[in-house]
Amino acid sequence: LEWKVDESGLSEKNRLLLSEIRSSDCCFVHVRRGDYLSPTFKSLFEGCCTLSYYQRALKSMKEICPSVKFVCFSDDIQWVKQNLELGNRAVFVDWNSGTDSPLDMYLMSQCRYGIMANSTFSYWGARLGRKKNRIYYPEKWWNHGTGLPDIFPNTWVKI
């Protein structure tokens, strides 16, 4: 699925990052915490995208593409910096907020690889745009009796 954006209106930071994404082996890492940790949603999403899930996906990604660069998106960038071992190969995208938030999804869509959160934002970032070499998604999408939604291509990797 193609997604067109008028890139002439992008900020300098986004233009530079987009250029890097398109010219190298970049993998987006999306971590959603915020509202998922609130009392309203905690019982539905707790234990789905665990630290172990991200660690296993990162390990696999580093093995299949040793030159990979990670482009991190999160509503809790500090947690990502403190908990995920990314070394010096990471960019932490913390400048798109408010009406610019959809630009994060666009940047995700341009990466060759992706490590998704259990989030439709992640899903569309993975599904749209550039052809992906590998996408990781959590085997547990939510704490609901219906299991995984039937939306994942066979080429994506469940962890």
Q: Where are the regions that the model predicts?
A:
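Leloir-type glycosyltransferase catalytic cores
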Residues: 144-159
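Proline-rich low-complexity regions
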Residues: 138-139, 153
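Residue-level detector of alpha-helical recognition elements and their boundaries
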Residues: 44, 140-141
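Solvent-exposed, flexible loop/coil residues
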Residues: 9, 40, 107, 155-156
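Short aromatic-enriched loop/helix-cap "lid" or pocket-rim segments at secondary-structure transitions
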Residues: 40-43, 84, 147-149
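Donor-binding and catalytic core of enzymes assembling or modifying cell-surface/extracellular glycoconjugates
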Residues: 55, 59-137, 143-145
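Secretory-pathway luminal glycosyltransferase catalytic domains
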Residues: 1-65
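Short polar catalytic/cofactor-binding loops
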Residues: 33, 141-142
